[in-house]
């Protein structure tokens, strides 16, 4: 352990974290990973451009959700999400991920007039033994709310 944080101090902080109720306030994004096999690429009939062929999908909580997931991984007693999602498919996926983490969602709202912020992250993958290895990230697609957050959600 580095000098600025002795091991004993870190152990004490992590032990105390188990008894805390931590609220994470912010923008919760869905990180949507699309693992593509480049050997299966084919041209689009509509545009002639390349169509990436997805062989696996993964979902994770992003942005404030990453902070919440890290607190859970560190053993925080209770982690509450304070924010909102849209009433859309991405929102349901984000909620499923959050529930899988065990986050408290009492302060997490569904807003019908908002998108669930999403980073769609396609990448090329290769087989690596029994699993997959990311070879190259492709162009990301961002879904964000471009209008100010309504007061009722702030």
Predicted regions and their residues:
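Short coil-to-helix leader/linker segments, especially the first N-terminal amphipathic alpha-helix
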Residues: 1-16
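Conserved N-terminal subdomain of the carbohydrate kinase-like
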Residues: 4, 19-22, 30-154
């Amino acid at each position: 352990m580095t000098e600025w944080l002795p091991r004993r101090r870190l152990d004490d902080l992590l032990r105390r974290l188990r008894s805390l109720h931590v609220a994470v306030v912010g923008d919760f994004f869905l990180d949507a990973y699309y693992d593509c096999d480049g050997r299966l690429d084919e041209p689009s009939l509509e545009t002639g451009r390349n169509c990436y062929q997805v062989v696996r999908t993964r979902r994770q909580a992003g942005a404030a959700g990453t902070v919440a997931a890290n607190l859970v991984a560190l053993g925080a007693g209770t982690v509450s999400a304070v924010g909102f999602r849209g009433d859309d498919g991405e929102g349901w996926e984000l909620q499923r991920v959050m529930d899988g983490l065990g986050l408290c969602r009492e302060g997490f709202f569904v807003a019908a007039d908002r998108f669930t912020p999403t980073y769609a992250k396609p990448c090329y993958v290769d087989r690596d033994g029994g699993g997959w290895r990311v070879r190259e990230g492709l162009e990301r697609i961002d879904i964000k709310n471009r209008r100010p957050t309504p007061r009722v959600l702030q």
